[in-house]
Amino acid sequence: MKPLSSPLQQHWQTVVERLPEILAEATLSVQAKSVLTFSDFVQDSVIAHPEWLTELESAPPQADEWRHYAAWLQDALAQVTDEAALMRELRVFRRRIMVRIAWAQALSLVEEENILQQLSHLAETLIVAARDWLYDACCREWGTPCNHDGVPQPLLILGMGKLGGGELNFSSDIDLIFAWPEHGSTRGGRRELDNAQFFTRMGQRLIKVLDQPTMDGFVYRVDMRLRPFGDSGPLVLSFAALEDYYQEQGRDWERYAMVKARIMGAADSAYVDELRAMLRPFVFRRYIDFSVIQSLRNMKGMIAREVRRRGLKDNIKLGAGGIREIEFIVQVFQLIRGGREPSLQSRSLLPTLSAIDALHLLPENDAGQLRAAYLFLRRLENLLQSINDEQTQTLPGDELNRARLAWGMRTDDWSQLTDILAAHMANVRRVFNELIGDDETDTQEDTLSEHWRELWQDALQEDDTTPVLAHLSDDDRGRVLALIADFRKELDKRTIGPRGRQVLDHLMPHLLSDVCSREDASVPLSRITPLLVGIVTRTTYLELLSEFPGALKHLISLCAASPMVASQLARYPLLLDELLDPNTLYQPTATDAYRDELRQYLLRVPEDDEEQQLEALRQFKQTQLLRIAAADIAGTLPVMKVSDHLTWLAEAIIDAVVQQAWGQMVARYGQPTHLAERTGRGFAVVGYGKLGGWELGYSSDLDLIFLHDCPMDVMTDGEREIDGRQFYLRLAQRIMHLFSTRTSSGILYEVDARLRPSGAAGMLVTSAEAFADYQKNEAWTWEHQALVRARVVYGDPQLTSQFDAVRRDIMTLAREGKTLQTEVREMREKMRAHLGNKHRDRFDIKADEGGITDIEFITQYLVLRYAHEKPKLTRWSDNVRILELLAQNDIMDEQEAHALTLAYTTLRDELHHLALQELPGHVAQECFSKERALVRASWQKWLVAG
């Protein structure tokens, strides 16, 4: 065993002062002193449980002791009679065994492969024991879940990721998926429960038993987001539902994740075999599947962006040449060839790497180098985490922990350790790049004219710039030179390291060459230089633009086209990553895929880290806005589609925010008890205005109201129980908070909830019954107008149907035509007087006479006026389709409806483009005279004439 270094010997004196008398220094072995000096986690544990140290000294950890975990735990649980005792015993057992594993690892008593095996088997043992205890308890309480033939149904648990692969790290969360075989109901209980209800309740209790922090800590952080549909999907799925999902909707990244899936505690049974057989075709294709290379390349890009966004340095998992790249190398062969090569179907990395070597799929010696690097990195990761039982892969910056790791890795000092580490990671990066590569070719040697270099370095006299800027006018040439000079002055105020200056000096001649070839050179340059000022101290982003010429070209063209895009990029430099791939930059996410994209995006963020979750939501929104704007600028999205995409994006974010708020509220208070006998959450979010009408713009806020269906006198079922209606109020308040909290990426959306019953004076969340009563008995005509453009954007089907029925009933009320006409017209006149165009020589596209709002009022008036005769008019909430309905139902002449639709979309298109130019929504008075005349004529016809 390697002696302790000088810093560690000094630290030992600090350790001695903490030890109780029962652990006197004189009685401790050299091994004990070494481990206690190395690991604060072990130190804290044996101070709390001195008998564990005695056990370690008398019966040191063995390589095969994982075989005894189940029996040891069974003995510990023998006297457990309630969940509180179960939670306590599981936590104490986990800590005791983790101390033994940390001891064995620090002293190199067992091989690193065996450490991974012990960590994984411990987790599986704890999960299975908790599941089995709870299954028996739930069966006693509710009866045994059976299929229609009376055969008992088990809960099967898929361990994903490193848990499934038998490669769990020391301090890790666990990714699980719950499933049960067949539908049916419970038998033998006090009352019958559907199997879905039984397993959902049991799953919730299992997560609580494993995940909830107590005075004894927790067993494992449980992450359920890899299940079908993520947080928005059922907690537990039947085999049939699983099969349908993976056959019809399974994504490449889910296939990638499923490679390592393993059934926890799987004994031989028909159900276990059935689940394995069902999942295998999804993971391993029968044909050689080279499409996976692009999918993995995309994932690699996501990781690189994540490293940049989070500013990760010295990260041995996600950094270049780290653990994740070794996993990618192995899994690319599994996913490409696994369907034809059974030896590649192992869940564990090292056996699969051996199979890859045996099949000669990698050049000679590469597999051996990858194996050595993997074992080195995994040992370093586990030692790092065992210092304080902390989930980290970032190398320490302090002297003590560096000395600890140097000792644990059996190197002389930190310098030697980092040299060996760098060599391993360089080997991994080389193999990774050769196998997966990049879409972009390496940057070509700089062949720019010396003029561009001199222009950047201010080595040209003004007269000398004529050859390179000859196509520009004298004024524009002067503006370009002034912009470059101002930019250099700004840089002088910044602290830029040698590497940053080097990258900038390489980038700027390229940028100037591309920008100055344009006739409008000063326009993009004036918009790009503020962005560069913002990122000069963040070398990774400068390198991105320097190393990827395509990204630089996209930056120039987008900034030239839109100051809004330039401002977004300057405020949020992380968006620069989106410039790397034109396939995604100019192709927005499919309208029905935003929820899934966001779910995948959020999987990278710890579920319990609210700050990171908030930041990720905002980053996702900014990324998607950039893609939509890029497609808009490129002319590939018409105005209707721009709004569709912006609306679907908002709905996906609303869904995620509700999920997050719901999880936080349930963790604090439990669920309202009226949900026990049903699925869903008894909650709905209704979108009004532009959101309800599928007409969002780039900077639109969200008009929302919140509904629930909670009866009176219902309480929540948590330890801190509160009134059910109070729960929904706090849920709505939490949702508002998540939307409005300002992070480094800004707020999510401005949310206006004043359209709720009684406006700002009313309750933030309303029961469905109270909402219906208010609409029937108290609401003003303008509130009924608003209802025309309202729809549920998140909610249970039952509550959605209730809202739709109320909306339909209100809109189909018989109204006296003249009275309605007067009320709608007077409301519009009040709005015009209140908002008043302050630019008398300009036309306000939205608010002025003949503008967008007039068209909206015409459609709302006609729906309220005629829906009692033509109920089909209530079907849609957007103006364009309402105009179609008015023509189809012979309320409005088809030619007039078409002309109003064209005027409406033309005016909205102009608003979108003004937003891209960061210009206000008004134009010269002579603009759109034809459209305005047409709208005024319709207004006169419907809302003025008798």
Swiss-Prot record:
It catalyses: [glutamine synthetase]-O(4)-(5'-adenylyl)-L-tyrosine + phosphate = [glutamine synthetase]-L-tyrosine + ADP; [glutamine synthetase]-L-tyrosine + ATP = [glutamine synthetase]-O(4)-(5'-adenylyl)-L-tyrosine + diphosphate. Residues 1-440 are annotated as: Adenylyl removase. GO terms for cellular component: cytosol. Its EC number is 2.7.7.89, 2.7.7.42. Keywords: ATP-binding, Magnesium, Multifunctional enzyme, Nucleotide-binding, Nucleotidyltransferase, Transferase. Residues 449-946 are annotated as: Adenylyl transferase. Pfam families: GlnD_UR_UTase, GlnE. One of its GO terms (biological process) is regulation of glutamine family amino acid metabolic process. The keyword Ribonucleoprotein does not apply. GO terms for molecular function: [glutamate-ammonia-ligase] adenylyltransferase activity; [glutamine synthetase]-adenylyl-L-tyrosine phosphorylase activity; ATP binding; magnesium ion binding. Its cofactor is Mg(2+). Involved in the regulation of glutamine synthetase GlnA, a key enzyme in the process to assimilate ammonia. When cellular nitrogen levels are high, the C-terminal adenylyl transferase (AT) inactivates GlnA by covalent transfer of an adenylyl group from ATP to specific tyrosine residue of GlnA, thus reducing its activity. Conversely, when nitrogen levels are low, the N-terminal adenylyl removase (AR) activates GlnA by removing the adenylyl group by phosphorolysis, increasing its activity. Belongs to the GlnE family. HAMAP family: GlnE. This is Bifunctional glutamine synthetase adenylyltransferase/adenylyl-removing enzyme. It comes from Citrobacter koseri (strain ATCC BAA-895 / CDC 4225-83 / SGSC4696). The lineage of its organism: Bacteria, Pseudomonadati, Pseudomonadota, Gammaproteobacteria, Enterobacterales.
